């Protein structure tokens, strides 16, 4: 094995190694999730050298410099104030979803008008209209971090793969017998997973366009689906009240998480893949050990359904959004509620941390999105202007652009 280059990854903090093994270029990452501005860099470099044979003594100064750059970045706490940059009347019929590419340079919108549109964030101009579906385009995604492909899942029971550059369709994936309502690329961008009202999920090969596996076992629609960070596991959440974890390379069921007593609304791994977080219409979130599938905690306190939940990149904080109009932040270590986010006047359907992990973004049926301090729970900003419910909101990779999508058929860019 021969080390070719070292690359920085800012969020979450880490160093990517590009190395050659038997003539092939491979990558692996050293995750530095606990890095903070006070970390002893020399001691950390020694630790890394002991654990990683590719990092030889001759590379230690370079690694030290990279870690110092990461530390500087972590020290820059963003107090960015967002302003409305553009309003896009994206589609004639209602929007279903919005998604950003990694850099935030472009984003996509799905709609009841059976199309997906690709937009330039800086100018607000439409770059492509992706046409071909015969029903609502509901689930959409970029193959981040690459960002050169788009997947669209439709009520017409198919998923299509598109080129970002040309807007041309590469493949149409057929096989589901009911609407596709969720989809995800694996981190390597070799597979697309689709979840459907037909109770199954399917994995598709991006190169060949062929179906690789069908994941069967749920008894109701699959509404949430995601890969873990390394891409070797996939998680599906269903209206049958359960969540199942599958092996991505064999399609084998690893285990089913049973314990919620109502429909699942979200299911995600934390960054290091040690924990799984599930949110449910039963008003609770549960934390599960990702190794054995055992429930390690139930997070309570909300008075109504949990509509969304997520980890920050360190996996130390958990955020939950509820139909009771509040969001909460829990500590993953103590499982206690750290702070409550109060201020919305309607249900909160979306919640996410910014990439730095110090801000939270919420979208609500009260027609506003809000930005909160993740430590104190203080509301820092209210993004107003939509005339109907906000169902989708997202940060870009740097955390300095926000997109909101609303039932008023517009998208707003904030920067």
UniProtKB/Swiss-Prot annotation:
Pfam families linked to this entry: WD40
Key word Endoplasmic reticulum present: no
Compartments, as annotated in UniProt: Cytoplasm, Cytoskeleton, Flagellum basal body; Cytoplasm, Cytoskeleton, Flagellum axoneme
PROSITE patterns: WD_REPEATS_1, WD_REPEATS_2, WD_REPEATS_REGION
Keywords for this protein: Cell projection, Cilium, Cytoplasm, Cytoskeleton, Flagellum, Repeat, WD repeat
Matches recorded under InterPro entries: G-protein_beta_WD-40_rep, WD40/YVTN_repeat-like_dom_sf, WD40_repeat_CS, WD40_repeat_dom_sf, WD40_rpt
A GO cellular-component term linked to this record: ciliary basal body
Superkingdom of the organism of origin: Eukaryota
Described function: Required for axonemal dynein assembly and ciliary motility in ciliated organs, including Kupffer's vesicle, during embryogenesis. Facilitates the onset of robust cilia motility during development.
Family affiliation: Belongs to the WD repeat WDR69 family.
Name of the protein in question: Dynein assembly factor with WD repeat domains 1
């Amino acid at each position: 094995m021969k080390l070719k280059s070292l690359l920085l990854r800012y969020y979450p903090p880490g160093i990517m190694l590009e190395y050659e093994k038997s003539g092939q270029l491979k990558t692996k990452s050293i995750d530095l999730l606990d890095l903070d501005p006070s970390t002893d860099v020399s001691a950390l470099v020694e630790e890394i050298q002991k654990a990683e044979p590719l990092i030889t003594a001759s590379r230690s100064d370079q690694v030290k410099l990279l870690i110092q750059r990461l530390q500087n970045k972590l020290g820059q706490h963003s107090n960015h104030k967002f302003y409305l940059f553009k309003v896009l009347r994206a589609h004639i019929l209602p929007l279903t979803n919005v998604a950003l590419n990694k850099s935030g340079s472009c984003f996509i919108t799905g709609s009841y008008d059976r199309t997906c549109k690709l937009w330039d964030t800086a100018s607000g101009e439409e770059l492509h209209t992706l046409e071909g579906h015969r029903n609502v385009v509901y689930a959409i995604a970029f193959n981040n971090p690459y960002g050169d492909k788009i997947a669209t899942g439709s009520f017409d029971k198919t998923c299509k793969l598109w080129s970002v550059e040309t807007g041309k369709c590469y493949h149409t994936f057929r096989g589901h017998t009911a609407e596709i309502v969720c989809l995800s690329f694996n981190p390597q961008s070799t597979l697309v997973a689709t979840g459907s009202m037909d109770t199954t999920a399917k994995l598709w090969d991006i190169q060949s366009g062929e179906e690789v596996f069908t994941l069967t076992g749920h008894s109701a629609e699959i509404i949430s689906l995601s890969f873990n960070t390394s891409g070797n596991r996939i998680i599906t959440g269903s209206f049958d009240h359960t969540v199942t974890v599958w092996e991505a390379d064999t399609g084998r069921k690893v285990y089913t998480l049973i314990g919620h007593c109502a429909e699942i609304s979200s299911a995600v791994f934390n960054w290091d893949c040690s924990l799984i977080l599930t949110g449910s219409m039963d008003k609770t979130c549960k934390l599960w050990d990702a190794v054995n599938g055992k429930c390690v905690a139930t997070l309570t306190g909300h008075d109504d359904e949990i509509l969304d939940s997520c980890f920050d990149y360190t996996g130390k904080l958990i955020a939950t959004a509820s139909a009771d109009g509040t969001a909460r932040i829990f500590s993953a270590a103590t499982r206690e509620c750290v702070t409550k986010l109060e201020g919305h006047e309607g249900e909160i359907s979306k919640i996410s941390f910014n990439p730095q992990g110090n801000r939270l973004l919420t979208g609500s049926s009260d027609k506003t999105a809000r930005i909160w301090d993740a430590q104190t729970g203080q509301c820092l900003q209210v993004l107003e202007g939509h005339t109907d419910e906000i169902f989708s909101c997202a940060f870009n990779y740097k955390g300095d652009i926000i997109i909101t999508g609303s039932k008023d058929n517009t998208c707003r860019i904030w920067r």
